[in-house]
Swiss-Prot record:
The lineage of its organism: Eukaryota, Metazoa, Chordata, Craniata, Vertebrata. There is a cross-link at K785 (Glycyl lysine isopeptide (Lys-Gly) (interchain with G-Cter in SUMO2)). The gene is MAP4. The modification N-acetylalanine is found at A2. Tau/MAP repeats lie at residues 869-899, 938-968, 969-1000. Non-neuronal microtubule-associated protein. Promotes microtubule assembly. Residues 54-67, 716-733, 786-795 have a biased composition (Basic and acidic residues). This is Microtubule-associated protein 4.
């Protein structure tokens, strides 16, 4: 399609592109409405043909239909078609966006395998990246995706794009082992240069990078071993799928190439596995579990790949060990519940993939990251113990709801990984934050890896634990979340939203399971991204907290996991929340604050929540629709219809569930999805839990509202994400900023944003759920605008600054500024939130949270504002510099004054005109001097002026010119006059004339001369010499002068006349 995109751009594809644009808008609308969710099965069937038939257009349709074709995710053909379409789109986008398209191309193309379900949002993402090729298409793309992607693609233009993608990959990496391939390739590439767009290219190359490729080989080998451990064929198949998907998602080129090369045959197997996944949700779950495990292994491999540069191998080895544990745990889990393990494996894998994030470990604290993972690993092991207990219930819950969600979640996880890879694209802010954190990312990544690594044991041990491990991850991230409190709170919103969002996303997953997982993973990713971003400052606390939080997390996980064994995943989210809260007690408080803040935003932000909730609810609503879509779209996830509903309720309930009332509900239902989101948002979700405390009733509303607009909201979910993200920044003020940085940016990252937005919306929507329901619809379309407006509106109250700042940042420098603000601001936010936590720890969803949130919002907004103001101040400085430049113009004007001086000098020179040369020289000299000093337009102008003046001065020049002409004329005149005068002087002229005329006179002089009168012949002869008067003179001397004169004419006659006169004189003399 690259050629086609070029050739077709000139020829047919233009209309196709227009169709794509139309389809993109339609797809956006459809994605919003997700009415196609019902037709997803058809979309499935048609999805592949759409991709295959209309690779570009079809891909756009198929991509838009992938929303409905969520099930297609598991369909390799459609995924491959999506890959073609993605590749086409990617190529197209490569044409337009260049790297981002390419990056997304690979990512999406590979994601297409898993992300057929992700396609719904990724429809926006994937075919919208294609749209990125088409700026018009970009608009719909921008609506959801553009925030992040545009920032990422457009804002970084490639740098942020890359960074965004790279760092989003990082979040994806965090979220996905798969993306970690992408992210890890970037991590390997990016950690080397996070902001590096080239690293993004490298990261694309990293996809293909030998480093990534050979490393994925080892990781693949390890995962293969692990796969063999878990189930050689299934995991190998799933691994191939995951490796392929991960390779596709994470290192589309890298492992995708390596793994795809390796998995190329497996790709067929992956297609088979995907087909199997399509065929049976349980198989997909197993395959996904395998995929997840393989993705974990792939993640491990990817982590190894990413971390390979630094610690990935160590961490990867640990991860490899963890994956081994995971395999053991997964084997146990598989024994317990393959699907449970699927969800756990998925979660684990997602987080293990997040663990793959150990690329961070690679960078910052490879040892540190590794060591905390050890603590966390110990904790995960502990958690594994409690989670193993929980796993039994989780097996039931997971098998029951989790199996359903497992498939969906796995689908989501795969897709989410894909979606996260996309959302990696989406997390421009996150990536921006990551860019900011790029310096920090090592810590963050390390922390994430630690988190991931530590969680990987726990996650691996318990997939229910996976939530708990994810909590650990979140704990690790939560430690990251220590700084992540903001990030995690933002992500927590994302995660908190993800429960809803994930529930919503579960619904959305129905639409775009990817979105769910994306949201969950995005939440995780956002969390990780933000965690990675924010964790940098947090990391210090994070390390201490990581260990504390690890034990706390382990305890919390165990307690929550055990306590919520029935609701393992939700418990994990709760545990995550508790862990997030606990491991970052500030985070807990942050979570509480977040919840309070979110609640406050709920009341306060109700307006925004109406927007946010509207957005979030749209997500929620879309999730319901999405659930249907998911159910329809994802055959494996079809079970999810109840789950989506459950998730919808649990989503709504998830917030309460986090409180622990709905946890049982939510966990089983939204467990898988929430597992990711909860894990991601565990700490972050806490706001949801707190919010859910106040929102318990509202979340149901949201489900209802969500249910009512399931189809519409999905797209909107994607779109609202920016709004939600903007709102999330609000809610999370400081975290919100990181969140908004990731979230707002996620315009492209809308998936991630959606989780945040849903969480935010969920948190905010408790009060404004009904409002949101009505508002969200408009907002989704306006999501981007809404992002500005809702965020502004909400933030106008308390966070007007943060929202504006977040939005401006996301809009302006969303990735850069936000990342800057997020790291700088997020820690302040984290600190304030931590400070707040003391007051906020009580979860009263009443005023205190609200108060807290305003406080948090205001401090955060102040800090962000300060940061942003600082950025703005520097911008004004530049402007001032420009004004100074304007003064430079004044300086130039001063040379103009010099012109006057030059004129004066010229005038002075003018008096000297008399010596015209001197006058000219003087004028030129002064002018030249005047001109030289001005150096610039003034000089030129002065020269012009001077020249004109000089001309006037020179006026003599005209005279000079005249002189040459006049001189010639004068010379001629003189010659004539001279001759005449001479003749007059001779006075004999008459005689001379007479002499030729009358020889009589001569006869008088001498008769002999009279005969010469007939001398004309001789005169003729002399006439030849006429030219020379001298010749005539000799002739005259000869005495023939008279004849010569007669023969001669004109001047010669005159000259000869003189000569003749002389001759005559001589004759007379001689006669005398």
């Amino acid at each position: 399609m690259a050629d086609l995109s070029l050739a077709d751009a000139l020829t047919e594809p233009s209309p196709e592109i227009e169709e794509e644009i139309k389809r993109d808008f339609i797809a956006t609308l459809e994605a919003e409405a997700f009415d196609d969710v019902v037709g997803e099965t058809v979309g499935k069937t048609d999805y592949i043909p759409l991709l295959d038939v209309d690779e570009k257009t079809g891909s756009s349709e198929s991509k838009k239909k992938p929303c409905s074709d969520t099930s297609q995710v598991e369909g390799t053909p459609s995924s491959q078609a999506a890959v073609l379409a993605n590749g086409d789109h990617g190529i197209e986008r490569n044409d337009v966006t260049g790297f981002p398209s390419e990056f997304l191309e690979e990512k999406m193309a590979y994601q297409g395998y898993q992300n057929s379900q992700n396609w719904p949002e990724n429809t926006n993402f994937c075919f919208e990246p294609e749209h990125m090729v088409n700026p018009i298409q970009t608009d719909p793309f921008k609506m959801h995706h553009d925030d992040g992607l545009e920032d990422s693609l457009f804002f970084p233009s490639g740098t942020t794009n890359t960074s965004v993608f790279v760092e989003q990959n990082d979040p994806l990496k965090d979220t996905y082992g798969m993306l970690p391939c992408d992210t890890f390739a970037p991590a390997a590439v990016v950690p080397q240069g996070w902001s590096a767009e080239a690293p993004n290219l490298a990261h694309l190359e990293s996809f293909t990078s030998p480093e990534a490729v050979p490393q994925p080989l080892q990781p693949t080998a390890e995962p293969a071993e692990k796969v063999e451990m878990a189930s050689g064929e299934e995991r190998a198949e799933a691994l191939e799928m995951m490796m392929k998907l991960q390779a596709a998602d994470m290192a589309p080129s890298r492992e995708a190439e390596m793994v795809l090369a390796k998995d190329v045959v497996p790709a067929t197997e992956t297609g088979v596995a995907l087909a199997k996944d399509m065929e049976s949700p349980t198989k997909p779950d197993e395959a996904l579990v395998k995929d997840v495990e393989s993705s974990i292994e792939s993640d491990m491999a990817l982590v190894k790949d990413v971390v390979l540069p630094v610690q990935t191998e160590e961490t990867a080895v640990k991860d490899a060990i963890l994956p081994t544990e995971t395999d053991v745990s997964l084997d146990e889990d598989l024994a317990l519940s393959t699907e449970t393990e699927v969800s756990t494996a998925q979660d684990i894998l997602l987080f293990k993939e997040t663990e793959s994030i150990p690329p961070v470990t690679m960078d910052l604290a490879s040892a540190e990251g590794t060591v905390p993972p050890t603590d966390q690993e110990m904790t995960p092991v502990k958690v594994a113990a409690s989670l193993s207990e929980i796993e039994a219930p989780l097996d039931e819950d997971i098998v029951s709801s989790t199996e359903i969600r497992s498939a969906k979640e796995i689908g989501l996880s795969s897709e989410t990984e894909v979606a996260l890879s996309r959302e990696m694209g989406l997390p421009p802010e996150t990536e921006a934050i990551l860019d900011k954190d790029m310096a920090a990312p090592p810590e963050t990544e390390v922390i994430v890896p630690v988190k991931d690594m530590a969680p990987s044991p726990g996650i691996e041990t318990t997939l229910a634990k996976d939530v708990a491990p994810r909590q650990e991850i979140e704990v690790t991230l939560g430690k990251d979340t220590v700084s992540l409190p903001a990030t995690e709170m933002a992500l927590g919103r994302n995660v908190a939203l993800p429960p809803e969002t994930e529930v919503t996303l579960a619904k959305d997953v129905a639409q775009p399971p990817e979105t769910e997982v994306n949201l969950a993973n995005n939440a995780a990713l956002a969390k990780f991204s933000e965690a990675e971003v924010v964790p940098v400052p947090v990391k210090d606390m994070e390390t201490a907290q990581t260990q504390e939080a690890t034990s706390e997390d382990s305890q919390l996980k165990s307690l929550q996991d055990e306590g919520q064994s029935a609701v393992p995943l939700m418990t994990s989210p709760e545990a995550v929340v508790a862990m997030g809260q606990k491991h970052s007690l500030p985070t807990d408080e942050d979570s509480v604050l977040e919840e309070l803040e979110q609640k406050k935003p709920s009341s306060q932000t109700s307006e925004l929540p109406s927007e946010t909730s509207g957005v979030a609810k749209p997500e929620e609503g879309p999730p319901t629709g999405s659930v249907s879509g998911n159910d329809i779209t994802a055959p494996p996830n079809k079970e999810l219809p109840p789950s989506p509903e459950k998730k919808t309720k649990p989503l709504a309930t998830t917030q309460p569930a986090k409180t622990s009332t709905s946890k049982a509900k939510t966990q089983p239902t939204s467990l898988p999805k929430q597992t990711a989101p909860t894990t991601l948002g565990g700490s972050n979700k806490k706001p949801m839990s707190l919010a859910s405390g106040s929102v318990p009733a509202a979340p149901p509303k949201r489900p209802a509202a969500a249910t009512s607009r399931p189809s519409t909201l999905p797209s909107k979910d994607t779109k609202p994400k920016p709004v939600a993200e903007a709102k999330i920044p609000e809610k999370r003020v400081s975290p919100s900023k990181p969140a908004s940085a990731p979230a707002v940016k996620p315009g492209s990252k809308s998936t991630q944003a959606v989780p945040k937005a849903p969480a935010t919306a969920t948190l905010a929507s408790p009060g404004s759920t009904s409002r949101n329901l009505s508002t969200p619809l408009p907002k989704r379309p306006t999501a981007i605008k809404t992002e500005g407006k809702p965020a502004e509106i909400k933030k106008m109250a308390t966070k007007s600054a943060p929202a504006d700042l977040s939005r401006p940042k996301s809009t302006t420098t969303s990735s850069v500024k936000k990342s800057t603000t997020v790291p700088g601001t997020a820690p302040p936010a984290g600190a304030p939130s931590r400070a707040r936590p003391t007051a906020t720890p009580p979860r009263p969803s009443g005023t205190p949270p609200v108060d807290k949130k305003p406080t948090a919002a205001k401090p955060t907004s102040s800090a962000p504002r300060l940061g942003r103001v600082a950025a703005n101040a520097s911008a004004p400085d530049l402007k001032n510099v420009r004004s100074k430049v304007g003064s430079t113009e004044n300086i130039k004007h001063q040379p103009g004054g010099g012109r006057a001086k030059v004129e004066k000098k010229t005038e002075a020179a003018a008096p000297a005109r008399k010596p015209e040369p001197n006058a000219v020289t003087k004028a030129a000299g002064p002018i030249g001097n005047a001109q030289k000093p001005p150096t610039g337009k003034v000089q030129i102008q002065n020269k012009k002026v001077d020249i004109s003046k000089v001309s006037s001065k020179c006026g003599s020049k005209a005279n000079i010119k005249h002189k040459p002409g006049g001189g010639d004329v004068k010379i001629e005149s003189q010659k004539l006059n001279f001759k005449e005068k001479a003749q007059a002087k001779v006075g004999s002229l008459d005689n001379v004339g007479h002499l030729p005329a009358g020889g009589a006179v001569k006869t008088e002089g001498g008769g002999s001369e009279a005969p010469p009168c007939p001398g004309p012949p001789a005169g003729e002869e002399l006439a030849i010499p006429e030219a020379a008067p001298e010749a005539g003179a000799p002739a005259s001397a000869s005495g023939l002068s008279g004849h010569t004169t007669l023969a001669g004419g004109g001047d010669q006659r005159e000259a000869q006349t003189l000569d003749s006169q002389i001759q005559e004189t001589s004759k007379w003399l001689g006669l005398a």
